[in-house]
Amino acid sequence: MALQDVCKWQTPDTPRPSIHLPQAGGWAVPRGCDPQTFLQIHGPRLAHGTTTLAFRFRHGVIAAADTRSSCGSYVACPASRKVIPVHQRLLGTTSGTSADCATWYRVLRRELRLRELREGQLPSVAGTAKLLAAMMSCYRGLDLCVATALCGWDHSGPALFYVYSDGTCLQGDIFSVGSGSPYAYGVLDRGYHYDMTIQEAYTLARCAVAHATHRDAYSGGSVDLFHVRESGWEYVSRSDACVLYRELQKARSLEQELEAKACGIYPEPATPQGARECKELFVEQEEVTPEDCAIIMKTETM
């Protein structure tokens, strides 16, 4: 929740000029109309679909995403890049409108470079997240759609922040954004712990995105994997999501078979006494003859 929501603050009717986008404010709307109201009524409704995730652990920050860019049922690009480098120690995942994400990441790079020249150092990950949230909050209510997870390493260690176009800025250990995020969260919540090894983190990220692409119709293609270390970010791999999911299913089936054998779901009797007890449990009942009925009736009359 953004600070504006907590304070019950509403965006002004006329957006103020932005110092970050010099051409902002010249909205192509009829004269006398409020841009915010006009866009909410007549603006195009764009379809979004993606799966991006990031999580922080002892050895840095992992960022992963699928590569399918889609607009509804139309697949625009099966091999797009949804994890964008900002500088040597900072990455960002992109979810939302592609044009908005690309524009604001260019603006963010420019602002960070200017601050580096003025102050002699780059801002922290927290400062970068607050800067991006403040810049985009000027366009709150104008159908801007940018949801990003900033993954970086600064003087405080690995850091992860979620920033949304309405000004929301959250810090956390796990974030997943996009239409496939509910499926990715299910895998992440089950396998995540802060002290995991690097290979465990790689496997968890690939597994989460692969499961999301299998269940979410708007995610697919391949799985891009990045790792942010103290020395900088590293591009780990790109794996086909369909092939990866099949391999995970085979590994899961093999693991279940081994667990079944180890737990002894179909155990054999360990002793002759156990064998006799099992045999008694499944022995067939003898048929009741007329002589038996006569004996029973005689016993009842007595």
Swiss-Prot record:
It holds the Pfam family Proteasome. Its main location: cytoplasm. One of its GO terms (cellular component) is proteasome core complex, beta-subunit complex. It is found in: Cytoplasm; Nucleus. Keywords: Cytoplasm, Hydrolase, Nucleus, Phosphoprotein, Protease, Proteasome, Threonine protease, Zymogen. Expressed exclusively in cortical thymic epithelial cells. It comes from the Eukaryota. The modification Phosphoserine is found at residue 253. The proteasome is a multicatalytic proteinase complex which is characterized by its ability to cleave peptides with Arg, Phe, Tyr, Leu, and Glu adjacent to the leaving group at neutral or slightly basic pH. The proteasome has an ATP-dependent proteolytic activity. Incorporated instead of PSMB5 or PSMB8, this unit reduces the chymotrypsin-like activity of the proteasome. Plays a pivotal role in development of CD8-positive T-cells. This is Proteasome subunit beta type-11. It comes from Mus musculus (Mouse).
